Amino acid sequence: MIIHMMHMNLLESLIWLPFALYLFLKFINTNKFYFIILAGLTMCLSILGGYPQTFVFNFIFLGLFALYYIYKSYKSKDNKKVIQLIISVIIIVIISGGISSFQLFATNEFSENSERQNIGYEFAKQGSVHPLDIFTLFVPKIFGTFNWNDKADELSYWSVSKSGGHQEGSWMFTISTLYISLLALIFIIPAIRYYFNSKEKNFPLLFFGIVGLIALFFSFGGNFFVHKIFFDFIPLFDRFRNPGHITFIFTMTFGLIAAYGIDRLTEDKKQFSQFLNKKYLIFFSGFVLLFTLAFYTGIFKSLFPLSSN
């Protein structure tokens, strides 16, 4: 996600999730509760970052991750671990919510007296990612960029709705860009194939993959049905607009899957190389090359004739 300077509190809130996730995993592996105390303090910093939508996403992700391991422990009949995990979640909520309560209560009181108390769906879906934005995974500026002043030597964002494009305005470049680097993309598919062909299932690839895809579909907002379901049936989601702000969950989860692939390449090169082979690399490189050429030669833009009107 690319952030407006005026939206830095969004970044200041979301940035704590990877560290909280790391601490929670350390607790799972060691059963040492001081990691949970640190995780609670970390999530407190997420709340104090001052962007409610983002810290709600952070808590939901961490809660789902805890449920995933609670289910795994229950399935393996490790009741002691189940109890420990439930207690750990309660501790995180108490520490983070307790320390930041002075801000939470004030924020809730303010929201009850603001115009966003009863927002409609038309307002809530503002800032939706479009399925066409998936192309930004390969070329981040494929639709141009947010040209912040007349002297900036950048390609202006051209695919805007008033010209027949797919996005509501040039500012959507800061929300709808999904780029996580080509290096990460190279490893994602081999990592998934390796996981399903391996007996070792310690890495929660299925969890990250499913949650990441749900986050992506949610970010589509008014361009897909998932966001409307959350808006209608799940508390708090009718308080927020800009569903595209959830894309950091997609970025993180698929980045972790790519990291898993890199780890397997170093630890089990012979097996992993069956999936990260020359044939795959040639296909991937060729696709990216053709896609890049289509961008720089203007062929891609010519497929959107109305965007230049």
What are these regions (language model features)?
Residues M1, P18-F19, L38-C44, A184-I188, ...:
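Hydrophobic, membrane-inserted alpha-helices
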Residues M1-L11, C44-L48:
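Aromatic- and kink-enriched transmembrane "portal" helix at the membrane-lumen/periplasm boundary
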Residues H7-I15, F27-L41, Q53-T54, I60-F61, ...:
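Contiguous transmembrane helix-bundle modules in multi-pass membrane proteins
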Residues Q84-F102:
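Internal/C-terminal transmembrane anchor helices
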